[in-house]
Amino acid sequence: MLRLLVMLASIANCAGGLVLIATWATMWQRVPIIVLFIGASLLIQGAYTILYLRGDLDRWRDLATGALFAGEGLSAVVGAGGLIQSIIHNISNADMEMAPVLAGLLMLVQAVLALLFLLVTDRLRPRVNGRSAV
């Protein structure tokens, strides 16, 4: 069940990233370039997690798991920061912008779900000579 939730969150991240990239590409004169970078971040985060869950990165074993752990940890911090900042911005300004709130929420939720998946499936256990150290 958790695997399915992580997969759905990853697909949502890819879709959200593509929407932000397309928004910047079609209206680049009026949309700040940070929208492109946030969209690329969401797309990369979602795509890497999908590849990991499908087993396409199995040949990299612990390196792929470590990269997923590091990337999702960083995404959780950035997503939480973006979510908090966008909520504070919306509270202090009359114009409510929901896109930054949704982008931060997408990034944070997918990161937390992926980290929980790694923890629950016991993939973060240290290894010595190819075997579990614990």
Feature roles, as predicted:
Residues P32-G46, F69-E72, E97-Q110:
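Alpha-helical transmembrane segments of polytopic membrane proteins
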Residues A47-A80:
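Loop-to-transmembrane helix junctions at the membrane interface
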Residues L8-G16, A70-V78, L106-L113:
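Alpha-helical transmembrane segments of multi-pass integral membrane proteins
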Residues M1-L4, T26-Q29, D56-G66, I91-V101:
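Juxtamembrane loop-transmembrane helix junctions in multi-pass integral membrane proteins
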Residues M27-I34, V77-L105:
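Interfacial non-cytosolic loop connecting adjacent transmembrane helices
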Residues M1-I44:
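N-terminal signal-anchor transmembrane alpha-helix
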Residues R3, H89-A133:
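Alpha-helical membrane-associated segments of multi-pass integral membrane proteins
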